[in-house]
Design a protein with these regions (language model features):
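Alpha-helix C-terminal capping/helix-to-coil transition sites in glycosyltransferase folds
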Residues: 5-7
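Catalytic-core regions of glycoside hydrolase
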Residues: 224-227, 233
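Aromatic-enriched alpha-helical interface/lid elements that frame and gate functional surfaces
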Residues: 233, 239-254
């Protein structure tokens, strides 16, 4: 009903991940422009449907990745592309915290809060009984609603190397983590992506690996003191030095 209002020009989609696609599609079909919070969608098929509809309806669209607009990330991009640390040989991205590793809740009677339309909240997800552990922040743990730490926070930290190095599709990916759970995202994960060579700002850049870590710190690349200081972050390893960054700052290293 909201998107049918004639006096609305655009819609901001900031719902849990599992309804990003359906909300964006409904808005574009109603002729509205869309600003959708990251991650754009939960599955590849949803992404294809949303992007096809954006082209078809010719609506103005943007995916919001908040840290991207800050001056710190822009400065890191400038340093990397200017050759301040030489040719980039590898990148490491890590987040010390984690969302996931939960055991599916036992079903027991729970009353739906009076201010919550549970059916509407589920959206495209198959019907299931209400549980408070599936709402608010905790929806991120579950495959039905989110994608764990990589989908939730990876968008922010991966944004920087993708931008600075003009990365696109990986040619391979190898993951290491706990046993796969059909309901819950992994509490820790290490993923090694391989990206092909490409041209960035008129320069040829060779293929390189990018490794993601969450739930466990990559102690082989930084000291405990550095982990404590930087928390989560990104490390560019170049032929002439290294560059470390997080949301709020960056530093050149030998």
């Amino acid at each position: 009903k909201l998107v049918e209002q004639k006096d609305l020009d655009a819609v901001v989609v900031a719902t849990p991940d599992h309804t990003h696609a359906v909300a964006s599609v409904a808005a574009m079909r109603a002729g509205k422009h869309v600003y959708c919070e990251k991650p754009l969608c939960r599955t590849i098929s949803e992404v294809r449907h949303v992007t096809d509809l954006a082209r078809e309806t010719n609506r103005v669209t943007q995916m919001g990745t908040q840290i991207h607009a800050g001056s710190n990330y822009r400065r890191v991009v400038e340093l990397v592309r200017s050759g301040a640390i030489g040719e980039i040989n590898e990148v490491h991205v890590w987040v010390g915290s984690s969302t996931g590793g939960r055991t599916r809740y036992q079903q027991f009677p729970a009353s739906v809060p009076g201010n919550l339309d549970w059916d509407l909240w589920l959206g495209p997800i198959p019907e299931q009984p209400y549980h408070p552990g599936w709402t608010h922040f905790h929806w991120r743990h579950w495959w039905h609603f989110g994608g764990g730490t990589l989908a939730d926070i990876g968008c922010h930290y991966m944004d920087l190397p993708f931008w600075a190095l003009d990365l696109s599709h990986a040619t391979s990916a190898e993951a290491e983590g706990p046993p796969v759970d059909k309901d819950s995202a992994p509490i820790w994960l290490k993923v090694r992506y391989q990206f092909p060579d490409r041209v960035v700002s008129g320069r040829h850049w060779k293929a390189l690996p990018l490794t993601w870590y969450h739930g466990r710190y990559p102690n082989h690349i930084l000291t405990p003191e550095q982990h404590k200081r930087w928390g989560s972050g990104i490390l560019f390893v170049g032929s002439k030095g290294q560059l470390i960054s997080n949301y709020g700052g960056h530093e050149l290293l030998p």
